[in-house]
Swiss-Prot record:
It is an enzyme of class 2 (transferase). Residues 53-69 have a biased composition (Low complexity). This is Probable phosphatidate cytidylyltransferase. It catalyses: a 1,2-diacyl-sn-glycero-3-phosphate + CTP + H(+) = a CDP-1,2-diacyl-sn-glycerol + diphosphate. It comes from Dictyostelium discoideum. It is a multi-pass membrane protein. It holds the Pfam family CTP_transf_1. Residues 1-28 have a biased composition (Basic and acidic residues).
């Protein structure tokens, strides 16, 4: 009996130990499960917190971007509303005050321009070159602040060096030829090798640009080079044709410049008094204050102005005649080109007969001056195409968030604001004149410039040949 009790007691102890072991195992398992569960929960919570943080950061970023976009839009809208014309929200007194300032400053600029034109072709050419310098300065200044922030080395130095190179290529040769007449030993070399010296300057600028490249701003530096070359092409190259027009006769400079000024004035006043009263939509999205009424009205007034102002300019030889080899401030007299002379137009007999038979109209002959009809073509270009030069400039101002390129002229802005349409107009005049008006003849000035590039021995050969030809033609010697 006692033995059975002992056996039963042992079995109970074993069962209890097994139960305790299983219980401890279950506790460990549950503990590990709890730890895994808590770890998973922690990772889930951490992931959720990271996700929430990312959402908060993204939301802040989006808010900042939205704020920046709103600010940028406000700046652009503000510059658009103020860029060219008066704000629609301005009170009448403020509008008329701005109109008065703009009118007074415009009259001053026209007066100064008239004084420059009354001097000499050379002075007018220098005036155009001075305008190029000011336009280049204003355009480069748009990106100078950004370049300064990025610490671009020699930014201004390289820009002005490329400008000097382009000036030397386009304008130095005539000056060197003139100086070679007085100091042949010094300047003859530069006349003969002008093209080589121009190329050498370009190579120097190219190498200097490569040497100034800095890691981290490569893209920006190349964009700056592109910007500079674009300015040189748009300003210096096109202005070179303006100067060529001047020496063909001041009329080819005064007339197109006056057409652009006239178109700008009448577009402003027509838009000021009639804008959006008949067509309530902007002319161009890039420049919302430009109106259809101003555009259409200015075209009509510009056509009338070009026709009659051209007739006025024909009264003066110093405006019509090309410069040639005359000295500084000398009076000009020339045999006028047929385009400046009156012609009689007679209608063909067939047209005269039809007009009288069906319309009861007698078509009589009339006199006209060809240049006045050419002036109408120039006026159409100046009214329909040249204003896009202004829209191009407006796009640049919107891109860089500025109202005007400068504030040198109150109510008008900078030099670029006043000459943005003149460059493409000057190029058009050069192409139109050489294509449809200029007669095919040998230019003595061009021959003289080439003779001055020769050495003294070569000049003596030319001299002897010319002497023999003149003596033979005049009969002073026998053949």
């Amino acid at each position: 009996m006692r033995t059975d009790n002992i056996r039963n007691r042992k079995e109970q102890l074993k069962k209890q130990e097994k139960k305790d072991f299983d219980s401890s195992k279950d506790e460990e398992t549950s503990t590990s499960d709890e730890e895994e569960s808590s770890g998973g929960n922690r990772s889930k919570i951490a992931g959720k917190e990271n996700h929430q943080n990312k959402n908060i950061i993204n939301q802040k970023t989006n808010n900042n971007n939205n704020n920046n976009n709103i600010k940028e839009k406000d700046i652009i809208d503000s510059s658009v509303n103020n860029a060219d014309n008066l704000k629609a929200t301005d009170p009448p007194s403020a509008k008329y005050k701005k109109l008065a300032i703009r009118s007074v400053m415009g009259a001053f600029m026209i007066g100064f321009f008239t004084i420059v034109l009354s001097t000499d072709h050379f002075i007018v050419a220098l005036f155009v070159i001075a305008l190029q310098l000011l336009v280049f300065k204003e355009m480069i200044a748009l990106r100078y602040i950004e370049a300064k922030e990025k610490k671009i080395p020699h930014f201004r130095t390289l820009n002005w060096f490329f400008l000097f190179t382009s000036f030397f290529f386009f304008y130095a040769k005539p000056i060197l030829i003139t100086l070679a007449n007085y100091y042949p030993d010094i300047f003859q070399h530069f006349v003969r090798y002008h093209l080589w010296h121009s190329f050498s300057l370009y190579c120097i600028g190219f190498v200097l640009f490569i040497l100034t490249l800095r890691k981290g701003v490569y893209r920006y530096q190349f964009s700056q080079l592109t910007w500079t070359l674009m300015i040189l092409m748009m300003v210096v190259v096109q202005s070179n044709f303006l100067i060529s027009n001047i020496y063909q006769g001041l009329i080819w400079f005064i007339l197109p410049v006056s057409i652009i000024v006239c178109n700008d004035i009448f577009a402003y006043f027509n838009g000021f008094f009639l804008g959006k009263k008949f067509i309530n939509r902007p002319l161009m999205k890039i420049s919302p204050n430009k109106t259809w009424e101003g555009f259409i009205g200015a075209t009509g007034w510009t056509l009338l102005f070009a026709y009659y102002f051209c007739g006025f300019l024909l009264k003066y030889d110093w405006i019509v005649c090309p410069k040639g080899n005359t000295g500084f401030m000398e009076s000009l007299h020339c045999t006028r080109d047929p385009v400046f002379l009156e012609k009689e137009f007679i209608f063909p007999p067939e047209i005269t007969t039809i007009a009288f038979k069906y319309l009861g109209i007698t078509l009589l002959p009339f006199t006209y001056i060809p240049i006045q009809f050419h002036a109408l073509v120039l006026a159409l270009f100046g009214s329909l195409i040249a204003p896009f030069g202004g829209f191009f400039a407006s796009g640049i101002k919107r891109a860089y968030k500025v109202k005007d390129f400068d504030t040198i002229f109150p109510g008008h802005g900078g030099v670029t604001d006043r000459t943005d349409c003149q460059f493409i107009m000057g190029l058009f005049i050069h192409v139109y004149y050489n294509t449809f008006i200029k007669t095919l003849e040998i230019d003595p000035t061009f021959i003289w410039q080439n003779i001055m590039m020769l050495s003294m021995e070569e000049k003596m050969v030319i001299y002897e040949k010319l002497k023999q030809s003149i003596e033979f033609t005049t009969g002073t010697i026998t053949a």
